[in-house]
UniProtKB/Swiss-Prot annotation:
Free-text description of this protein's post-translational modifications in UniProt: Cleaved by autocatalysis into a large (alpha) and a small (beta) subunit.
Record-given protein name: Oxamate amidohydrolase proenzyme
Catalytic activity: oxamate + H2O = oxalate + NH4(+)
Keyword Protease part of the UniProt annotation: yes
PANTHER family hit by this protein: GAMMA-GLUTAMYLTRANSPEPTIDASE, GAMMA-GLUTAMYLTRANSPEPTIDASE (AFU_ORTHOLOGUE AFUA_4G13580)
Site (Important for catalytic activity) location in chain: S360
Highest taxon of the lineage: Bacteria
GO biological process entries: proteolysis
Active site per the UniProt annotation: T342 (nucleophile)
Keyword terms: Hydrolase, Protease, Zymogen
Subunit structure: Heterodimer that consists of a 35.5 kDa large (alpha) subunit and a 20 kDa small (beta) subunit, which are synthesized from a single polypeptide.
Organism listed in the record: Klebsiella pneumoniae subsp. pneumoniae (strain ATCC 700721 / MGH 78578)
UniProt EC number: 3.5.1.126
Molecular function via GO: peptidase activity
Amino acid sequence: MHSSNVSTHGMAVAPHHLASQSALAILREGGSAIEAMVAAAAAIAVVYPHMNGLGGDGFWLIVPPEGDPIAIDASGAAGSLATLEAYAGQRHIPNRGPQAALTVAGTVSGWVEALRISRDLTGRALPVARLLADAIGYAEDGIPVTASQAHATASKLEELRHQPGFSETWLVAGEAPRPGSRFRQPALAGTLRMLASDGLDSFYRGPLAERLAQGMAALGMPITLGDLQAHRARRPGPLTLQHQQGTLWNLAPPTQGLVSLAILGITDRLKMADADDAQTVHRIVEATKRAFALRDAHITDPRHLDVDVQQLLTPEALQPLADSIDDASASPWGGGKGPGDTVWMGVVDNSGLAVSFIQSIYHEFGSGVVLPDTGIVWQNRGAAFSLDPQHLLALAPGKQPFHTLNPAAARLNDGRVMVYGSMGGDGQPQTQAALFTRYILQGVPLQESISRPRWLLGRTWGQSSDSLKLEGRFAPACIARLRELGHDVEVLADFSEAMGHAGAIVRHPNGLLEGATDPRSNGAAAGY
């Protein structure tokens, strides 16, 4: 799959084709890219339920045809009952169960804030009920189970089947659903109908919020109704990198947007255009190690930062990191942050308004906890907190956890505008770097830049080792060379879902829209 889809009026890219089609339908009805993205976000919460959902977080990067981008941080903070004392006697926060479900789910608040921006930009609005219609229909009528959902359910079954509400919601006769079977989510359909009738804000302030809070209390989750009511999405200023090819943007802390920009800022000072595969992988991997070190030293709740993160992206900060890379030897590597189940999606409309968006519940099926009578599986993003009170990521009520999520965008010197991203924990910034380097610097066609074999340093969902993982389609000589350089290479399948689900849309100066999706996903680039 090496040919991009090209359209003239609108383009939507998602890792599930039904979400792409939901966005496209809104574009055809005259909706904005933002409204189309809300429709896609709701749809994919239903059709890719192991990856994301209403019980997760979201981040937006909205790029208008002219002017600065607008970022939305729709991530939730730790609940008011999530104290260090509440976890006394434990070495770390559990990855599953009610104690893992300790942060407010923010993604729906991001939909609210994004639609407010859409109205401000366009002066019009489609009804929320229209934006949620496809999602409601898929939840009621059933979705075709993907191989990805079936595999995620089966592989994590023993650690999840006893979590509250999991078996009743996600299993069929006590087992993982079969790929290609029809899977219904009636409780989630009811929740979506409430949001359509009462408004999206009812998730935090209304009858739905009260239902959620009652379920949380019954399950022993450390989130209260007051925590839901206090939550609002925020609009932080995005991080900016001045690259030789143009201006790049990503999200500020608590995300690892710094990592994605730092990798490209470091490699911008290396000779990437003519690098062969082994050199490309080696240099980006070495830049990744240095960017991860910045992340691990600094990134936390933005109210607790000890540095101006934007200053870490200046030429003065990046040049020494580039100079420290040895083309003949791999540097030591200490390990990554871990997995992340996520979806990235992009939409560009006829006006040139572009959206880069990411939505996640962290691990596969998040905490595994499904709130009673809602069909909502709650995220376990709070597992990223530390129980060490001196740690940068120490747990505290009202504190935001670290996020791997980071949607990217670029406005290039030649007039192209690009939104791009990927799911995949530690792999997200690496995949962004691979895509940008191949397409922008090395002249590889957009779709081929995503389809070509990829690599991953560290861990992502489905993987627990910290090795340098390569897809098996890399040439044997490339794999051998990377081992000679000192990398701990592990070869995976030819097309491995561990590499994430990437996507991109490019708006060309002539107005044509080019979309590419990942053959590792169930996605589509849908345009008209």
